């Protein structure tokens, strides 16, 4: 490695377990303010038989997590990425992208044909990430967040 190169940390993806709940809640509160899911909401999401959840680790740190659901819509399976959280100190290291791809791969394995998510309209870094991965804006959701900020629904086809 050259001296002026920055080593990109290795992101390890693993399934979320019930033992991770408190860490997920703490990370959710770090990442979001008024929109943060409560402990009960996170637990309920994780206990859903349709849930797919992964944790990202960098060294010993929990760097982030993703929770997604497989939903049925007009007889087709559709993935819903409910939340992607990346710890502040682990942003801009590929953690969000790694979590997004892990969720998409798992949704595809569960026969989801497409995936959608909601993102704050003012979250430019997330919007750039999703757009680069082929997500397109499909709906504007006015006053989606409790603070009155709109969300954008973005969708991506998972079928090749």
Positions of predicted regions on the chain:
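Terminal substrate-recognition subdomain of acyl/acetyltransferases
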Residues: 1-6, 143, 148-160
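Acetyl-CoA-dependent GNAT
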Residues: 6-11, 15-89, 100-102, 106, ...
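Conserved hydrophobic/aromatic "anchor" residues
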Residues: 32, 65, 90, 129, ...
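Short secondary-structure capping/turn micro-motifs that flank functional sites
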Residues: 44-45, 123-124, 146-147
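Short aromatic/hydrophobic contact patches that present stacked aromatics
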Residues: 83-85, 116-118, 153-155
